[in-house]
Amino acid sequence: TNVGNALGTALFLFFLLHGLGQPSAVAQDNLLLLIVVYTVFVVIASVVTGIVSDRTGNRRTLTVAATVVQAASGVAIALVPTFEMTMVAAALMGLGYGAFSTVGLAFAADLLPDEQDHARDLGIVNVTAALGQLIGPVLGAGLVALVGGFWLVFVAAAVLSLVGGLLTAFARHPVRTS
C-alpha cells in the first residue's frame, strides 16, 4: 500500500507538467494545492479512523476499507486525467493513506507474536513502509517510460493498494509465546 501511495504522490509534479501539460509556474502552484489537500485528508482520516478503530476494535475491516479508498484515487485519475479529478484523487488518497497508516499500524501491532520483540517487529514494519516510499517513484518512472504516459502509474497504484488490502484481509493472528 505504501508503494501505491508513493506511485500516486511522488509523481504529481511530473503528471501536472507532462500529463496535463501545465506550465511550470502553474504546475508548481497546483502541486502545493494537491499537497495541502492530501495532507489535510491524511490528518483527518488518521485521527477519525484511529478513534473509530480504538472504539470498535475492528482494525482489519477499517484497514482493508482504507486500501479500497486509496485504490479509488488511482482509478479516478486514470479514468479522468484532469486537474479537478487530480484534486479529488489527492483527497481520496489522503483519506485512504491516513486511515491505512494509522489503523494498519495498530492492526500490525495486534498481530505481533512476542511482546519482548515488539520494537524489533515494529522496526521491520517501518522499514517496509520506507521501502515502499523508495520503490514507488522508481517504479512509477519506469511505468511512464514504458507506456509514454501516466495512466499505468495510477492503475498500478490502485492495484498495489488492493493487493495490500488483500494481504491485510488474510493476515492471521499468531500464537503468542508469552
Give the label of every model feature segment:
Residues A10-D29:
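Short amphipathic helix-loop junctions that connect adjacent transmembrane helices
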Residues I44-N58:
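Helix-to-loop junctions at the C-terminal end of transmembrane segments
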Residues T61-A76:
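Structural signature of the two symmetry-related core transmembrane helices
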Residues A78-A89:
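Helix-loop junctions at membrane interfaces in 12-TM secondary transporters
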Residues A99-P113:
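Intracellular juxtamembrane helix-capping segments at the cytosolic ends
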Residues Q116-L146:
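A late C-terminal transmembrane helix in Major Facilitator Superfamily
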Residues G140-S161:
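A membrane-interface helix-boundary motif in multi-pass transporters
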Residues V155-S178:
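Multi-pass alpha-helical transporter architecture, strongest
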